[in-house]
Amino acid sequence: MDLQLPRGTRDILPEEVSKWHFLETEFKKVCENYQYEEIRTPVFEHTELFERGVGDSTDIVSKEMYTFQDKGGRSLTLRPEGTASVVRAFVEHKLYGEVSQPIKMYYNEPMFRYERPQGGRQRQFTQMGIEALGSDDPSIDVEVISLAMEFFRKIGLINIKLVINSLGDKESRLKHREALVAHFEPHIDEFCAECQVRLHKNPLRILDCKKDHDNPLIQSAPSILDFLNEESVAYFENVKKYLNALEIPFEIDSTMVRGLDYYNHTTFEIMSVEEGFGAKTTLCGGGRYHGLVREFGGPDTPGMGFGIGVERILLALEKADIKIPAKKPLEVYVITAQPEAELKAVTLVNKLRQNGISAEKDYLKRKFKAQLKDANRKNAVYTIILGEEELQTGNYQLKNMETGEQEAVSETTILEKLINTKGEN
């Protein structure tokens, strides 16, 4: 019997959770400042949702999904990415009928992919992302990109670069597809078995192949930018114009197609350029999709979004030596100098907590010095000492653990004093 963690998963222990809270809080603040509202979707969906939405020619669907049959014989899959579920909810609940458009949502949820575990990549991972549904204006593309860049600025990640591309509209992609087939077909035997299948199914996926990434034929493949029609060129030019207006620097990479089949027009990645973190490590990726809502049974509705892997962001912060703010400090540790003070300690700690002051006491019946050491280990700002004299007089010893200053404060005023002190800080 194996009772240890499954490969590709991890426990987030209490001392680490504050780092996650920091990222979640900052992401929430930025999203809500941009008027995005949170959505929460099920951990598992019908398998067909991802086959149709993500694309059955992608690595995610063909290799990486956790799929199982339930007791009713239904094929279900743990969600491998966030967009398909959000769009499914958008269609199922007819959010496209809302008066206020676009519908702007964010999420922060666990995802599951059967991949080889490595730094910043697990089989269960957490993804933060946004989706804006209902606008085909290029300014919403730039808003989505701007939100991601603002989030990275807020958490201190500045050694990053934005890379963009355009996959054009359907007409542009069909012409590019024909050119790719003509380019690769005479040499298809030089590619992996998967790419040989992709040639006529979805040749764009060959550009994204991990095995054949260094093949010179990929480097010399026809560029999508040479096949953009007039409308697609104008759209991409507007995206670049808005980015320049916001003074967001960017590079263009015509080979960047992303790992999902639903993208069209704008795609982008935000990469770390932090020394020692690995070349072109992607921290955020996203793009525009116009056919997904219709694919799921809704009306033609354009969308734009991105996803960010939390584990990878934490690794990037560590590599950049960025200190995450510590968790909320323990404000008061109540020390009992004798057993008779225990009841008073319980009631005092409870009263402090009810008034918004974090408080703790000893639960192991330790001696006075051991309790004091415990207060130090927990970095308590103050200690309140309850002994025989304090119980008789109702005056408690309040000690500032940083300065060592100690004063007697009456039971009736100690709460007011602590609240006032907290307000000053």
From Swiss-Prot:
Please give the name of this protein. Answer: Histidine--tRNA ligase
Provide the alphabetized UniProt keywords: Aminoacyl-tRNA synthetase, ATP-binding, Cytoplasm, Ligase, Nucleotide-binding, Protein biosynthesis
Q: Spell out the HAMAP family in the cross-references.
A: His_tRNA_synth (MF_00127)
Give the main localization category: cytoplasm
**Record GO terms (molecular function):** ATP binding; catalytic activity, acting on a protein; histidine-tRNA ligase activity; transferase activity
> Which Gene Ontology BP annotations are present?
histidyl-tRNA aminoacylation
Give me the Gene Ontology terms describing cellular component: cytoplasm
User: Could you tell me the EC number(s) of this protein?
Assistant: 6.1.1.21
| Organism per entry | Listeria monocytogenes serotype 4b (strain F2365)
Q: What class of enzyme is it?
A: ligase
Against PANTHER family, the record matches this protein to: HISTIDINE--TRNA LIGASE, MITOCHONDRIAL-RELATED, HISTIDYL-TRNA SYNTHETASE
Compartments, as annotated in UniProt: Cytoplasm
